[in-house]
């Protein structure tokens, strides 16, 4: 029978519930348990697909094509279970489902209310996410409830998990609550009152926390933990200190050493072998002992919020670890780059242009791609980054001076990038769209496979077939591919059905490392293996740094 751990948060948002949940899952998995995680988001949007990155951060895409919360990226990087559409749902999805049932007459004329209809539907979604009765069923499902206790948006979710815990009976569920313990510099002490109040508010809803994770900028002394225990009705061993660390990969060891996993296993009556966290210790050692440093210029549109590129940041750091190097990322707003000052990118060892939507800042990205191509600086373009590299090449090499994307100029005479009108989705169904289609849920999403041409840089990285996750509406226009090929651009991967362009590159006798990919490889990177594309990109950056230093000896790098 699947056991459940419900993770809630109090006082303020952004405490790190996602990292805490993923870390607990990682420890339980190291004990031999099959674990999954589910994220409940209390906003009314159906999914985060149409939300601004400044509002929500990155949209993480699963293999089956779900646009989800960025916490699912943490989940996949910390445990081996792959996330699915069922692992993330929102208030919008719940209400949409309930209203559809009401319209069909499924409720047999009853008055549809938050309790029981909304709360029952939430419980059904949680069970679906845990894979109950299917091949995806797990030993433990950790359910992270977004928002903060006390928010009106979260109340139906908290009521639903309270009911669910009651129905499952004792020892089948546990509650973990994150709180904030601020350090007041003027007083020179930690203040526990906010944590006392959030635990009290949780009890008023009918939920008693089994463990309190107390977030602070420093370890919490034993006397303060005892005080929190007394006023929150949580045993002292259940008051866990969770202080700031320089890498998130230290959190599993931190929580384990304070006995969180043992407490949860005792509460759920689960007998397991001891936790094995050696690989986490080795990972932290690799983070803390780089042999060299490499600097990457990330030229993007959403650089004011690093969470907009969360998986990308992690993928670069993973690749750095595989190459025994610290990766220093400088975020550069593409709106600030012009052909006149693009040379300021010369100090970097490589240039990366990530995905994005809309016209703002596009010309700056095109200038960055041109600088990388002409200066022989390693370049990786992802999604829009591939498209701007294609536009740049068409304008300045292929002679198509007015080349553009119909996303930025619908009337362009040379639409080298255009809207995809038909494609096969991750589940094999054929999808169509046009300029008047809704924005939400109409992109090419999820894992897609492509054939890779032999003898190319892409083939040396991926082999014969590449399968990666996608999230885009626009694609290289097949009507211009022959002209681009004739001008020297290598189209090294095409989809197997529609022959859509997936990878473009320059011959290695023309440029040492220049590649654009239509997909999002960052979603499949892990701290254990990195990702072959990013591993190769960071190695190319290290090689470029060595060449720029006049042939200085390069330390061994592994791609």
From Swiss-Prot:
Q: Summarize where Mg(2+) binds, as residue positions.
A: 71, 144
Question: Which residues does the annotation say bind L-glutamine?
Answer: 356, 384-387, 407, 473
**Per its UniProt record, what InterPro entries does this chain match?**
Class_I_gatase-like, CTP_synthase, CTP_synthase_N, GATASE, GATase1_CTP_Synthase, P-loop_NTPase
User: Which residues are involved in binding ATP?
Assistant: 14-19, 71
Q: Which residues form the Glutamine amidotransferase type-1 domain?
A: 295-547
The record's disulfide annotation reads none
Q: How is its activity regulated?
A: Allosterically activated by GTP, when glutamine is the substrate; GTP has no effect on the reaction when ammonia is the substrate. The allosteric effector GTP functions by stabilizing the protein conformation that binds the tetrahedral intermediate(s) formed during glutamine hydrolysis. Inhibited by the product CTP, via allosteric rather than competitive inhibition.
Q: Where is the active site?
A: 383, 520, 522
Residues binding UTP are 13, 191-196, 227
The protein's annotated catalytic reaction(s) are:
UTP + L-glutamine + ATP + H2O = CTP + L-glutamate + ADP + phosphate + 2 H(+); L-glutamine + H2O = L-glutamate + NH4(+); UTP + NH4(+) + ATP = CTP + ADP + phosphate + 2 H(+)
Q: Its quaternary structure?
A: Homotetramer.
Question: Can you name this protein?
Answer: CTP synthase
Q: Which organism is it from?
A: Variovorax paradoxus (strain S110)
Q: What does the organism's lineage look like at the top?
A: Bacteria, Pseudomonadati, Pseudomonadota, Betaproteobacteria, Burkholderiales
